[in-house]
């Protein structure tokens, strides 16, 4: 069933792909690899795991509208990270390269979403200063965010605009 597809994609990709930074793999600070590139190299960073899981689940018949790449801040590890979110009728599930167990987004409160995209749709997440009310848009540039588990969040910068990131996973 559906849960089996999610578990299979998460466990297979986590077991098949070795974590390696973009600098080590591609000689670049940040590179969003296609699923084929990640498989060919047998390695990738967190967003490469998420892209490969997304591609695998699409091939298994999971609707694209249910699959979302989420770039977030992991407040417990003080870094930026990327995961695959899966929207279900029972809430949002997170497929993560740091754990084989699939978790509900509510089970990972240290993950603060920054931006996400699914197909041709994209979102910027956040709250207004001094408020817990989510905002719809942001004036904050996303050009300084690059998910990578091995680099502390304050030192990150991204080398691709969101439109190019979306194009690389389609």
Predicted regions and their residues:
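A structural boundary/capping signal
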Residues: 1-170
């Amino acid at each position: 069933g559906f849960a089996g597809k999610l578990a299979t994609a998460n466990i297979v990709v986590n077991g098949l792909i070795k974590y390696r930074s973009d600098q080590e793999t591609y000689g670049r600070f940040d590179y969003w690899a296609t699923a084929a590139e990640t498989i060919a190299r047998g390695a990738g960073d967190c967003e490469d795991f998420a892209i490969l899981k997304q591609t695998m689940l699409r091939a298994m018949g999971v609707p694209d509208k249910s699959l979302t790449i989420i770039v977030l801040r992991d407040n417990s590890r003080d870094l930026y990270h990327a995961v695959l979110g899966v929207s279900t009728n029972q809430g949002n599930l997170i497929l993560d390269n740091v754990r084989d167990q699939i978790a509900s987004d509510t089970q990972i409160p240290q993950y603060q979403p920054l931006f996400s995209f699914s197909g041709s749709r994209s979102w910027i997440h956040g709250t207004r200063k001094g408020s817990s009310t989510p905002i719809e848009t942001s004036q904050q540039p996303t050009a300084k965010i690059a998910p990578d588990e091995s680099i502390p969040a304050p030192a990150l910068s991204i080398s691709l605009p969101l439109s190019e990131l979306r194009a690389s996973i389609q």
